[in-house]
Regions:
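Active-site loop-to-helix "anion-binding N-cap" substructures in soluble metabolic enzymes
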Residues: 46, 53-59, 82-92, 208-224
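N-terminal metal-binding scaffold of metallo-dependent hydrolase/deaminase domains
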Residues: 1-31, 357, 361, 366
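C-terminal cap of metal-dependent C-N hydrolases
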Residues: 4, 326, 335-368
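Divalent metal-dependent hydrolysis catalytic cores, especially in the metallo-beta-lactamase
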Residues: 52, 67-96, 112-125, 151-161, ...
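His/Asp/Glu-enriched, well-ordered alpha-helical/loop segment
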Residues: 219-229, 249-258, 263-340, 344-347
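Active-site core of metal-dependent hydrolases
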Residues: 148-268
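Active-site gating loops and adjacent loop-to-helix segments of metal-dependent hydrolytic enzymes
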Residues: 71-82, 126-150, 193-205, 219-229, ...
Length: 368
């Protein structure tokens, strides 16, 4: 590989990354300050824990959509992701999970790695659906058990205020499922109680949850006061830059996601989001009533947006790679060091993506 400014856990190295059999074996070079040279940046590949679609395809469309989605997102530097479902009837969710279970066992050439599933709904508050279809219902352990047998579900979004959900949070978190608070009308107290029961993060912080008020802190207040992790959509549409800065100061391991829809990587027009039809225009995706419906954000643009609001490149990278990996307990992803997967992205000095590598394989995304 050519010489780069390589971001490692111990800082910047001017040098070369050496990899074999999909893993980093060495990083050769010397410590540096990228400001002292004009070399490109080599960063860990982006890890997106909230992906509904891309390239015109939607996860809920099933197996025929998965390769399109993973090939689309790898073009923008996402080297691994969680396939994220929508609220839907039980049989539809079961079918998609069954197909995802098989897909997670492979990685087609030229694609990002699917690390597992983020089940966003149906265990959410029907009063805070956002862009979710109206199939929300109370969680039943037998139903969740059936889902878990179909696919590697890593994350479940849940509204903690619904009766019985506190016990589910406790039981599933003990089994290693990351339980996230989201699509909720819960109070501050209910948010804090959910964290105590084992919830570990918040789904698209600020969006589709009870807001912060100085006498009713709400779920947002619980996150800002107590969370170690939370996801946030940094498209500069879903969350004001000022609110982003508040979260960055308050939540140590805040990480960023796209919450991308089928419209990601596509021109303006109409696309599917679960059972909804959404419209991409003016840089966003909306339902017919104007409600924001996921995003068209890509992770390379997320990096540029974080730098735009004042984060150094190293911290922006951390919130797109290392923190998502840490959240899922993935020690071999999200950082560039010997023993880690050779997942990396090269960007020029304007932060434009020029090269992507997934598990040591160079992606020919320019001709995709």
């Amino acid at each position: 590989m050519p010489e780069d400014n390589i971001l490692t856990p111990s800082g910047w190295i001017r040098g070369r990354l050496v990899h074999e059999h999909g893993k980093v074996v060495a990083i050769e070079g010397t410590p540096c300050d990228p400001a002292d040279n004009d070399l490109p940046y080599l960063l860990p590949g982006f890890i997106d824990l909230h992906v509904h679609g891309g390239g015109g395809a939607d996860i809920m469309e099933g197996a025929q959509a998965f390769e399109t989605i993973t090939r689309t997102h790898v073009r923008f530097g996402t080297t691994s992701l969680l396939a994220t479902t929508m609220t839907a009837p039980v049989d539809e969710i079961s079918q998609v999970l069954s197909e995802l279970g098989s897909f997670c066992e492979q990685r087609p050439a030229g694609s990002a790695r699917v690390l597992g599933v983020h089940l966003e709904g149906p265990y959410i508050n029907p009063g805070k659906l956002g862009a979710q279809p109206n199939f929300a219902h109370t969680a039943l352990m037998a139903e969740v058990e059936a889902y878990l047998r179909l696919a590697p579900i890593r994350v479940i979004t849940i509204a903690p205020e619904i009766a019985g959900h506190d016990g589910l949070i406790r039981a599933l978190s003990e089994r290693g499922v990351r339980m996230q608070i989201g699509h909720t009308l819960g109070s501050y107290e209910e948010g804090v109680a959910a964290l105590a029961a084992g919830a570990t993060s918040f789904t698209h912080l600020y969006n589709a949850m009870s807001p912060l008020h100085h006498r009713e802190p709400g779920i947002v207040g619980a996150a800002l006061a107590h969370a170690q992790y939370a996801e946030l959509i940094p498209d500069l549409l879903h969350v004001h830059p000022g609110a982003m800065r508040v979260a960055l100061r308050s939540i140590p391991c805040l990480y960023c996601v796209t919450d991308s829809t089928a419209a990601a990587g596509m021109p303006d027009g109409e696309y599917k989001l679960g059972s909804h039809t959404v419209t991409k225009c003016l840089g966003g995706v909306r339902l017919a009533d104007g409600t924001l419906a996921g995003s068209t954000l890509t992770m390379d643009q997320a990096l540029r947006n974080l730098v735009k609001i004042g984060l150094p490149i190293s911290e922006a990278s951390q919130r797109l790679s290392q923190f998502p990996a840490d959240y899922l307990g993935l020690e071999e992803r999200g950082r560039l060091q010997p023993g880690s997967f050779a997942d990396c992205v090269r960007l020029d000095r304007s932060l434009i993506l020029t090269d992507v590598m997934v598990e040591g394989d160079t992606i020919d995304f320019k001709n995709a």
